[in-house]
Amino acid sequence: MSSAKEIKKSILAPVLDNNPIALQVLGVCSALAVTTKLETAFVMTIAVMFVTALSNFFVSLIRNHIPNSVRIIVQMAIIASLVIVVDQVLKAYLYDISKQLSVFVGLIITNCIVMGRAEAFAMKSAPIPSFIDGLGNGLGYGFVLITVGFFRELLGSGKLFDMEVLPLVSNGGWYQPNGLMLLAPSAFFLIGFLIWAIRVFKPEQVEAKG
């Protein structure tokens, strides 16, 4: 992966062409849990990008020295170490957000996207392409999180990043917040609409009828 075109493709392809959530249906649980606010969705995106990119890099770096029988354990050990770093940094510098994200930072360890890229790509590729692949898949995951988080916070509370955007009835405005948007089912609906929109734009992603 030497050309700028290939690097660009590796980073941008997971956003629409091969999105981990919208096409592969991976990492959905955290997408439901951390998208009530745009702030938590953004921080979770950065966390997953960091873990996916660096775990890919380190797994690729030692891939030729990992016995096949313990490769999954080694991958999980690397991922877990990076997740612990992220968790400690959040607790030290963004404690309130860390509390809101709760156990879902720790559950990055079991995120199918992170494990999947380490096994499917990093074990077969050089370190730099693996790092870029991790960034791209983290970005694709974050694209869905941030999109869903944007609509859930805006429609659910009339705010973005805790700043009032839609004038609330309680403050003399016209917007009555939709409480449903703050509940997990709304994330299912929004992810469904997003998948539909992507497949309208990218009809080749529609499954062939049997």
Swiss-Prot record:
One GO CC annotation: plasma membrane
Similarity-based family: Belongs to the NqrDE/RnfAE family.
TM ranges: 11-31, 42-62, 72-92, 103-123, 131-151, 178-198
Stored InterPro entries: NqrD, NqrDE/RnfAE
Function text: NQR complex catalyzes the reduction of ubiquinone-1 to ubiquinol by two successive reactions, coupled with the transport of Na(+) ions from the cytoplasm to the periplasm. NqrA to NqrE are probably involved in the second step, the conversion of ubisemiquinone to ubiquinol.
Lineage start: Bacteria, Pseudomonadati, Pseudomonadota, Gammaproteobacteria, Vibrionales
Main location (coarse class): membrane
Name listed for the protein in its UniProt record: Na(+)-translocating NADH-quinone reductase subunit D
Annotated Pfam families: Rnf-Nqr
Membrane topology designation: Multi-pass membrane protein
EC number(s) per entry: 7.2.1.1
Class of this enzyme: translocase
UniProt GO MF annotations: oxidoreductase activity, acting on NAD(P)H, quinone or similar compound as acceptor
GO terms of biological process kind: sodium ion transport
Alphabetical keyword list: Cell inner membrane, Cell membrane, Ion transport, Membrane, NAD, Sodium, Sodium transport, Translocase, Transmembrane, Transmembrane helix, Transport, Ubiquinone
Subcellular location: Cell inner membrane
